[in-house]
């Protein structure tokens, strides 16, 4: 269940990221950790790699933006990172960027059982996610897809 402050914090994070040449990928608030942790994932708007220095440099402005809004009333740790291998693909841009990369698709079959299919990502459209599995195209109904995750080339 998402944290109740997520709808208030997300626009602050998105606008702060945009002001510094980044795009907000994801934000999570982990309250099971002490102190709670706010995880912010960013990527460059020009598509180039995000460096450790970029993350460190963005931490200050992001922390200041959160503090100025006074939304978090308890101590927290702010973590800035970028998506990497093993991350779930979510946006249309993710699916375009990682076309032909090895992925694992988690989906529900016609009987409602969870299934996993590994292969090279071909595309995601309004109806299907298409994966190349050893030279054969596997079409999985988009409505059945639970997640699509990057995997290492060896599986």
Curated annotation (Swiss-Prot):
UniProt keyword Membrane present: no
Disulfide connectivity for this sequence is none
Q: Which UniProt keywords apply?
A: Cytoplasm, Ribosome biogenesis
Where is this protein localized, as stated in its record? Cytoplasm
Sorted alphabetically, the Gene Ontology BP terms of this entry are: ribosomal small subunit assembly; translation
Cytoplasm as UniProt keyword: yes
Q: Name one Pfam family in it.
A: RimP_N
Question: What GO CC annotations are associated with the protein?
Answer: cytosol
Q: State the function annotated in the UniProt record.
A: Required for maturation of 30S ribosomal subunits.
UniProt record similarity statement: Belongs to the RimP family.
Protein name stated in the entry: Ribosome maturation factor RimP
Q: What is the originating organism of this protein?
A: Synechococcus sp. (strain WH7803)
Q: What is the lineage of its organism?
A: Bacteria, Bacillati, Cyanobacteriota, Cyanophyceae, Synechococcales
């Amino acid at each position: 269940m998402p944290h109740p402050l997520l709808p208030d914090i997300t626009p602050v994070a998105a606008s702060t990221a945009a002001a510094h040449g980044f795009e907000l990928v994801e934000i999570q608030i982990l309250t099971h950790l002490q102190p709670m942790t706010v995880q912010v994932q960013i990527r460059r708007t020009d598509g180039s790699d995000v460096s450790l220095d970029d993350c460190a440099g963005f931490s200050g402005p992001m922390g200041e933006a959160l503090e100025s809004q006074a939304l978090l009333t308890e101590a927290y740790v702010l973590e800035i990172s970028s998506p990497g291998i093993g991350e779930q693909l979510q946006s249309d841009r993710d699916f375009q960027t990682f076309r032909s990369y090895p992925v694992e698709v988690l989906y529900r079959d016609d009987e409602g059982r969870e299934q996993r299919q590994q292969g090279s990502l071909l595309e995601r459209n309004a109806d299907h996610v298409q994966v190349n599995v050893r030279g054969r195209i596997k079409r999985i109904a988009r409505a059945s897809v639970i997640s699509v995750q990057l995997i290492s080339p060896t599986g």
